[in-house]
A protein has these predicted regions:
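Alpha-helical transmembrane segments and their helix-helix packing motifs
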Residues: 2-263
Length: 263
């Protein structure tokens, strides 16, 4: 009789910390074409997830209360799932993983800043590409959906500085945990489940994600919204700051305090 060997389908927290640090090193060490191509895909995938959110949430009558937001939030995670399972680079998950590798002294500050800068630009191009060609040109973010697109975009640009910062913190605490749990799982189903619920939660709550905003604000602008480029830029800066604090401190920082060894 052959001996039954049980293999865990997940990593223990200490193992997960070391694995995430290695992932951060790999992300920071990638070539320029690696970062640009996967960064474009990362921005585009998040935008497609947001497009699905707008179509679903915008089609539910107001009489059903929060059902539209809940159902929209349920389909949004497809974007991050495509990134974490299929391949892509997302600035918010890199704020967690690459910063963790920096805290673990595996990457330099220069490598960290370079990675965040390049991935942010590539995400922006991917998100705006989807907003224009798959949203505006096709009409999917306009017509019957435009009321939802406009209301969502205006709510983003009209937040105060501190509202935006802490909304960004809450968002990337959850997005960082979505990436963390995806890294934890060893099979595809585990990665999908680990990603789904934290991402669904941040969308249902209404926290702000810098790459998601790279899609929805331009989508509204392409449709004729009275939103200026300066408002868009200001929102990007504020939400980027909040997202960085959430991913770098509440995920990477606290797990480094808990699990970093002296080796």
């Amino acid at each position: 009789m052959s001996e039954y060997i049980h293999t865990k389908a997940y990593l223990e927290p200490q193992e997960l910390y070391e694995y995430t640090s290695k992932k951060g090193v790999a992300k920071a060490s990638g070539s320029l074409k690696y970062m640009l191509s996967l960064g474009f895909l990362g921005g585009a995938f998040i935008a497609v997830g947001y497009l699905a959110y707008l179509k679903v949430a915008g089609s539910i009558p107001h009489e059903f209360g929060g059902l539209g937001g809940l159902l929209g939030a349920a389909v949004f995670p497809i974007g991050l799932i495509c990134i974490l399972v299929g391949g892509g680079e997302l600035i918010t998950s890199n704020m967690m993983a690459v910063t963790l590798a920096f805290f673990n002294k595996k990457v330099s500050l220069r490598m960290l800043v370079k990675n965040l800068f390049i991935i942010t630009l590539a995400n922006l191009v991917g998100a705006v590409f989807v907003a224009y060609f798959l949203g505006h040109v096709t009409g999917l973010t306009e017509g019957a959906t435009f009321a939802k697109t406009l209301a969502t975009a205006e709510s983003k640009v009209n937040t105060t500085f501190w509202q935006g910062v802490f909304s960004g913190v809450g968002c990337n605490w959850l997005v960082g945990m979505g990436a963390w749990l995806s890294f934890c799982a060893k099979d595809v189903s585990g990665k999908i489940i680990g990603t789904w619920f934290p991402i669904m939660t941040f969308v249902a709550v209404g926290f702000q994600h810098v790459v998601a905003n790279m899609f929805v604000i331009p989508a509204a602008m392409f449709g004729g919204a009275n939103i200026t480029l300066m408002q868009f830029f200001n929102n990007m800066c504020v939400i980027f700051l909040g997202n960085f604090l959430g991913g770098a401190i509440l995920v990477a920082g606290l797990y480094t305090i808990a699990y970093k060894t002296n080796n």
